[in-house]
């Protein structure tokens, strides 16, 4: 028999009971009568269909369900909060230490396996999850790293390294807004950490300025530079410099560069003169258009990737 009809009958039975004994106002009683009529029409059920009655009334079923709530089995996905034995804790630490050694040897897959074994023995240790996140990042599994960092933060919300490694993984996934938030949290917990400061700055730059699709190596916008009138003007000025023309002429002819220092080889003199010309060009750019120089500097910083130097130190 259709259980929906049984359920509808139980509800209608309950509403009729409320009409008789509920002590309701006239308006409330009228509303219940309308509700009963709607249910009877929708399900084709009336109170006379006693064959649909259940052994228990709806209030009795509800009371039984709420009273047994505490006896429901635990969600199997919930972490086991039973403290590990001393033997398991010691073995988990040994596995973690061995995993750290494998990280130093760049055996990242082995490290993931060892940290996983440590987690099986002691799933309440945030360090194990955070260390495995670092190994996952080394393997390019940034999604796995994010998940392990989330577990570590769930266990220990004050663990700064978990936030820092989360920022690294999110940056690698180009989720710079989220990375910025996690780097800021890491700095709140460890305000003197220079790596977090540097990575936060890089993530903020990447968030503000998306790399140009025509950018060159390292996402430096070469096309933009070549089309910038300030850059063209200063480059033309440099190329028309008598000093640079004399230098280039000497390098092409293979002769000694008169700009070099006495006693130095032609190659050394040419190199020193070329460096000097480059420095003069940079100074000229800084004096004539400091905003443009800052733009170039920002592009160079933006092209860098966050550093994991501090994060590579496993605990």
Curated annotation (Swiss-Prot):
Pfam families: SGTA_dimer (PF16546), TPR_1 (PF00515), TPR_8 (PF13181)
Gene Ontology CC: one annotated term: cytosol
GO terms under biological process: ERAD pathway; negative regulation of ERAD pathway; negative regulation of ubiquitin-dependent protein catabolic process; positive regulation of ERAD pathway; positive regulation of ubiquitin-dependent protein catabolic process; tail-anchored membrane protein insertion into ER membrane
Region (Disordered): 65-100, 249-270
SMART domains, A to Z: TPR
Disulfide partners: none
Keywords for the protein's UniProt record, in alphabetical order: Acetylation, Chaperone, Cytoplasm, Nucleus, Phosphoprotein, Repeat, TPR repeat
Basic and acidic residues bias (residue ranges): 72-84, 91-100
Positions carrying Phosphoserine: 85, 303, 307
TPR repeat segments: 92-125, 126-159, 160-193
Residue numbers bearing the N6-acetyllysine modification: 138
Compartment annotation: Cytoplasm; Nucleus
GO molecular function, one term: protein heterodimerization activity
Protein family (similarity comment): Belongs to the SGT family.
Job of this protein: Co-chaperone that binds misfolded and hydrophobic patches-containing client proteins in the cytosol. Mediates their targeting to the endoplasmic reticulum but also regulates their sorting to the proteasome when targeting fails. Functions in tail-anchored/type II transmembrane proteins membrane insertion constituting with ASNA1 and the BAG6 complex a targeting module. Functions upstream of the BAG6 complex and ASNA1, binding more rapidly the transmembrane domain of newly synthesized proteins.
Subunit and partners: Homodimer. Homooligomer. Interacts with DNAJC5 and DNAJC5B. Interacts (via TPR repeats) with HSP90AA1. Interacts (via Gln-rich region) with SLC2A1. Interacts with HSP90AB1. Interacts (via TPR repeats) with HSPA8/Hsc70; the interaction is direct. Interacts with BAG6 (via ubiquitin-like domain); interaction prevents interaction between BAG6 and RNF126. Forms a multiprotein complex, at least composed of DNAJB12, DNAJB14, HSPA8/Hsc70 and SGTA; interaction with DNAJB14 and HSPA8/Hsc70 is direct.
Protein name per Swiss-Prot or TrEMBL: Small glutamine-rich tetratricopeptide repeat-containing protein alpha
UniProt organism field: Mus musculus (Mouse)
Gene name as annotated: Sgta
């Amino acid at each position: 028999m259709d259980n929906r009809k049984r359920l509808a009958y139980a509800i209608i039975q309950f509403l009729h009971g409320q009409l008789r004994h509920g002590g309701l106002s006239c308006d409330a009683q009228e509303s219940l009568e309308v509700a009963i009529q709607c249910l009877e029409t929708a399900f084709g059920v009336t109170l006379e269909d006693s064959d649909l009655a259940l052994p228990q009334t709806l209030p009795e079923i509800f009371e039984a369900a709420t009273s047994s709530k505490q006896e429901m089995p635990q969600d199997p996905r919930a972490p086991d909060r039973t403290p590990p034995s001393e033997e398991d804790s010691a073995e988990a630490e040994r596995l973690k230490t061995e995993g750290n050694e494998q990280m130093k040897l760049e055996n990242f897959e082995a490290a993931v396996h060892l940290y996983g074994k440590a987690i099986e023995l002691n799933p309440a240790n945030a360090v194990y999850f955070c260390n495995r996140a670092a190994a996952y990042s080394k393997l390019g599994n940034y999604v796995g790293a994010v998940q392990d960092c989330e577990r570590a933060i769930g266990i220990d919300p004050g663990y700064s390294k978990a936030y820092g490694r989360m920022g690294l993984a999110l940056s690698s996934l180009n989720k710079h807004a989220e990375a910025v938030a996690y780097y800021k949290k890491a700095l709140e917990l460890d305000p003197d950490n220079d790596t977090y400061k540097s990575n936060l700055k890089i993530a903020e730059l990447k968030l503000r300025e998306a790399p140009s699709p025509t950018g060159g190596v390292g996402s430096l916008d070469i096309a933009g530079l070549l089309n910038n009138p300030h850059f063209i003007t200063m480059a033309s000025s440099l190329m028309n410099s008598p000093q640079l023309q004399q230098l280039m002429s000497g390098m092409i002819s293979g002769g000694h560069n008169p700009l070099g220092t006495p006693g130095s080889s032609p190659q050394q003199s040419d190199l020193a003169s070329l460096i000097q010309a480059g420095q003069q060009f940079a100074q000229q750019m800084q004096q004539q258009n400091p905003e443009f120089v800052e733009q170039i500097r920002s592009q160079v910083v933006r092209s860098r990737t966050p550093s994991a130097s501090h994060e590579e130190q496993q605990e």
